């Protein structure tokens, strides 16, 4: 009888993990608990994150009680030209000015926050289990997902790799890599260059 995980060699751990991947009974993955502090993401990202409800817990930075001193907002990759960037920056400056003027005029932060953009930068704590994280990665590593997601999952994978090694990290893949088919084929889904790989 083993009394500690330290009694399991790396080779045995690899063998156990390989067997775990061969079964649809993934309940054992739910015993692995992870907590991430995710900084520098947009509230658009966190609005999507909290839709993943089963197997997740969240604690988000409040904009109701916390005054935003220096507003930072994430500019999406499709804002490319100088004209577009200038319009974006001017708009963000106007919004930030309006927010602080409302606060200075006596408006409570919970009401003044209404003028802030969806892409304002925030932070969120995410607690989950490994099984739920595999599902999250499956959905959000898809090329149809917002690019911000792929970067966050990439960093999560590197943390998993640092603590538990390559096997656990590399198992965090787009759902099509696990199921060998695309699961995003509705009329409202965006085309993906990998669909042709699976849908032949």
State what each model feature region is:
Residues 1-200:
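Family-specific signature for flavin-dependent thymidylate synthase
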């Amino acid at each position: 009888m083993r009394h500690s995980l330290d009694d399991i060699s790396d080779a045995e751990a690899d063998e156990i993990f390989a067997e775990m991947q061969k079964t649809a009974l993934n309940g054992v993955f739910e015993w692995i608990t992870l907590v991430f502090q995710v900084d520098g993401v947009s509230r658009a990202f966190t609005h999507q994150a909290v839709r993943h409800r089963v197997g997740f817990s969240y604690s988000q930075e409040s904009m109701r009680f916390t005054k935003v001193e220096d507003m930072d907002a994430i500019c999406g990759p499709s804002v490319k030209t100088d004209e577009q960037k200038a319009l974006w920056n001017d708009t963000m400056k106007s919004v930030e000015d309006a927010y602080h003027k409302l606060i200075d005029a006596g408006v409570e932060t919970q009401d003044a926050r209404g003028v802030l953009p969806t892409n304002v930068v925030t932070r969120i704590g995410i607690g989950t289990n490994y099984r739920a994280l595999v599902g999250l990665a499956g959905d959000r590593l898809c090329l149809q997902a917002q690019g911000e997601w792929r970067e966050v999952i990439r960093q999560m994978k590197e943390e998993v790799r640092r603590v538990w090694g390559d096997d656990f990290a590399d198992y965090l893949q787009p759902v099509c890599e696990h199921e060998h088919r695309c699961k995003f084929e509705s009329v409202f889904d965006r085309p993906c260059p990998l669909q042709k790989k699976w849908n032949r």
